[in-house]
């Protein structure tokens, strides 16, 4: 719930310090020290883009005892070098490694020295940064109307899971309406689709997917203003909100404003403990049929897969599998982060994840659905933060967007291949059908702490799965 610390990185500079040269020693003159400080600061702030910020263990960010003169500055630089953070001061033509970056299903080669000939990879930091900064960034806000009957006019220190989930769903809507290749235009007026999506995530009850409405929809799963919530409860809150929203709009004008079916995947094929969640093809087909009001045609579908991949920490056997999900063209990333600090994880390089951080406090803004000249800058971020994959909380949720039947079939094929690589411990599995099982737990036992145990009931009358069990894998 608190902000993840990090260090900014400038994308371009020819200064020797930016190339990782030694820091000035404690015997440097005052003039040399001043020049060194100016060099490194100009390196950091010389560009509108901050390429990377990295999360370090909290012990690395404890307040330092006061030091003066060149000793303190040298100590600061040595500490950066020792923690492996000096690369963050490199220029835009440099990257942490020559490894590929996978970002929401697209591959980028950030190294200027080793360009890939693969048609699956795009070269250059500029292309990656344009993609990253075009993603919808949703953060803490303050100054909005009080949430329901509470006195909360801000979600600071407790709303990060809600904000992370809003980011993931917003990307699904962007991909649906504007396509994966869409980038934020540099000129106004903006497209009605883009502005309409931002409007839906505004901070008022009038906005379909606001924090106000999500908390209301998730009450039965423990969502409440001022309280933190886990990924499973958050996914179920979205399921409830989307269903309620669709029913309301269909009653008013015959149309819903969520343009896809939503499938929260959980439980194993028999509803018993110990199995991986199952993507059931028949359930997905039924959800699409219901979305299309009984027609057999396939609809776009959003899949949310809540998981617990360990107890106190992420089980390392799942790391390669999590990394590979970012290579799926259907990837929407992960709701996850350090314990108690949810983020929106959207990419991976080597064993580090790249994420958008909701822990920045901004004033609430009202973007009208028809205001194509609106200032949308607070919904975009050009600072990439990274975190070691093995440090993320084992409670997380993975998202996928499938545009049509062919896209869903491709997703199922990739997921099945991932199962084959899992050595008996898959993230989730794919099956044609599942059998309903007996009720094992009461719905009242669920809570919003990310460790919910829910009923397994098969399909309900709406074609959606009942409240299924969510187990530690």
Swiss-Prot record:
It catalyses: [protein]-C-terminal L-amino acid-glycyl-phosphatidylethanolamide + H2O = [protein]-C-terminal L-amino acid-glycine + a 1,2-diacyl-sn-glycero-3-phosphoethanolamine. Coiled coil: none annotated. The active site is at residues 160, 357, 359. Cysteine protease that plays a key role in autophagy by mediating both proteolytic activation and delipidation of ATG8 family proteins. The protease activity is required for proteolytic activation of ATG8 family proteins: cleaves the C-terminal amino acid of ATG8 proteins to reveal a C-terminal glycine. Exposure of the glycine at the C-terminus is essential for ATG8 proteins conjugation to phosphatidylethanolamine (PE) and insertion to membranes, which is necessary for autophagy. In addition to the protease activity, also mediates delipidation of PE-conjugated ATG8 proteins. GO terms for molecular function: cysteine-type endopeptidase activity; protein-phosphatidylethanolamide deconjugating activity. GO terms for cellular component: cytoplasm. Its EC number is 3.4.22.-. It comes from the Eukaryota. Its main location: cytoplasm. It comes from Oryza sativa subsp. indica. This is Cysteine protease ATG4A. Keywords: Autophagy, Cytoplasm, Hydrolase, Protease, Protein transport, Thiol protease, Transport, Ubl conjugation pathway. Interacts with ATG8. The keyword Nucleotide-binding does not apply. One of its GO terms (biological process) is protein transport. It holds the Pfam family Peptidase_C54. The lineage of its organism: Eukaryota, Viridiplantae, Streptophyta, Embryophyta, Tracheophyta. Belongs to the peptidase C54 family.
């Amino acid at each position: 719930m608190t902000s993840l610390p990090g260090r900014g990185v400038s994308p371009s500079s020819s200064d020797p310090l930016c190339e990782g040269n030694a820091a000035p020693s404690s015997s440097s003159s005052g003039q040399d020290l001043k020049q060194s400080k100016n060099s490194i600061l100009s390196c950091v702030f010389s560009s509108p883009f901050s390429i990377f910020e990295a999360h370090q263990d909290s012990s690395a960010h404890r307040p330092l005892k006061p030091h003066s003169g060149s000793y303190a500055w040298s100590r600061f630089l040595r500490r950066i070098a020792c923690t492996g953070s000096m690369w963050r001061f490199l220029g835009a033509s440099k990257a942490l490694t020559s490894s590929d970056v996978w970002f929401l299903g697209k591959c980028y080669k950030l190294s200027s020295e080793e360009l890939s000939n693969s048609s699956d990879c795009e070269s250059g930091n500029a292309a990656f940064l344009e993609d990253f900064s075009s993603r919808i960034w949703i953060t803490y806000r303050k100054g909005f109307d009080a949430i329901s009957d509470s006195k909360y006019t801000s979600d600071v220190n407790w709303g990060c899971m809600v904000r992370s989930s809003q980011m993931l769903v917003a990307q699904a809507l962007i991909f649906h309406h504007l396509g994966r290749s869409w980038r934020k235009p540099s000129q106004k007026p903006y497209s009605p689709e883009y502005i309409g999506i931002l409007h839906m995530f505004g901070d008022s009850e009038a906005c379909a997917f606001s924090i106000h409405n999500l908390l209301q929809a998730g009450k039965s799963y423990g969502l409440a203003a001022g309280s933190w919530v886990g990924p499973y409860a958050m996914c179920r809150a979205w399921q409830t909100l989307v269903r309620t929203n669709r029913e309301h709009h269909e009653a008013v004008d015959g149309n819903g404003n969520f343009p896809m079916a939503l499938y929260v995947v959980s439980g194993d094929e028999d509803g018993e403990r110990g199995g991986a969640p199952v993507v059931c093809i028949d359930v997905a087909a039924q959800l699409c049929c219901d979305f299309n009001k009984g027609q057999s045609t396939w609809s776009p579908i959003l899949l949310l897969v809540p998981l617990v991949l360990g107890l106190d920490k992420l089980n390392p056997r799942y790391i390669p599998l999590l990394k590979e999900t970012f290579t799926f063209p259907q990837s929407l990333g992960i709701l996850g982060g350090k314990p108690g600090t949810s983020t929106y994880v959207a990419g991976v390089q080597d064993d580090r994840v790249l994420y958008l951080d909701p822990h920045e406090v901004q004033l609430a803004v009202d973007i009208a659905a028809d205001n194509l000249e609106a200032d949308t800058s607070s919904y975009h971020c050009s600072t990439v933060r990274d975190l070691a994959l093995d440090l993320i909380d084992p409670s997380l949720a993975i998202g996928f967007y499938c545009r049509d039947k062919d896209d869903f079939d491709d997703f199922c094929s990739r997921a099945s291949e991932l199962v084959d690589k899992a050595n008996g411990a898959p993230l989730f599995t794919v099956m044609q059908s599942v059998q309903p099982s007996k009720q094992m737990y009461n719905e009242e036992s669920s809570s919003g702490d990310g460790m919910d145990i829910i009923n397994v009931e098969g399909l309900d009358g709406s074609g959606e799965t009942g409240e299924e069990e969510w187990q530690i894998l």
